[in-house]
Amino acid sequence: MKELARFSVTLPNELFDEINKRVKNTEYPSRSEFIRDLVREKIIADKWKDDSQSDAIAVLSIVYSHHQNNLVSQMLELEHHADVKIACSTHIHIDKENCLEMISLQGSGKNIEKFSQKIGSLKGVKFSNLARIGITKA
């Protein structure tokens, strides 16, 4: 088992109550595990702000109209000339008008962000969300 460090944190009562409520309403076994996950999320978010990060991973989810002229060809053009590695993409037909595409990306955080913005700004893209993924050592 990994060594653990114990420390004390002082919180306003309202924040402490909110944490307890969230732990109780989720599957977290303890406040400690909940807090560990919050710290990991913050570390990952801060790593994404570091332009030198070269090993970033993300999933870009987009909803778009497949009836939009040239949209699919524009997306493919951007994907083939991207400065990021596209590990895979999954395409789902939502209805007669809309498609959902999920694109797994690897590369520098800066290049992933740039690629996401290019795709999200295309005419016909109705929704774009970049899920930034990171792995911490603990």
Curated annotation (Swiss-Prot):
Disulfide cysteine pairs (residue numbers): none
SUPFAM superfamilies per the UniProt record, alphabetical: ACT-like, Ribbon-helix-helix
Record keyword Zinc-finger present: no
Cofactor binding annotation: Binds 1 nickel ion per subunit.
Pfam name, any one: NikR_C
Binding site for Ni(2+): H80, H91, H93, C99
GO terms for biological process, alphabetical: response to nickel cation
Cofactor(s) this protein requires: Ni(2+)
Gene Ontology MF annotations: DNA binding; DNA-binding transcription factor activity; nickel cation binding
Signal peptide: none
Domain of life: Bacteria
Xref: InterPro entries: Acetolactate_synth/TF_NikR_C, ACT-like_dom_sf, Arc_rbn_hlx_hlx, CopG, CopG/NikR_regulator, Ni_resp_reg_NikR, Ribbon_hlx_hlx, TF_NikR_Ni-bd_C
UniProt-listed Gene3D superfamilies: ACT-like. Chain A, domain 2, Met repressor-like
Keywords: DNA-binding, Metal-binding, Nickel, Transcription, Transcription regulation
PANTHER family per UniProt: NICKEL-RESPONSIVE REGULATOR
Functional summary from the UniProt entry: Transcriptional regulator.
Record-stated family: Belongs to the transcriptional regulatory CopG/NikR family.
Protein name: Putative nickel-responsive regulator
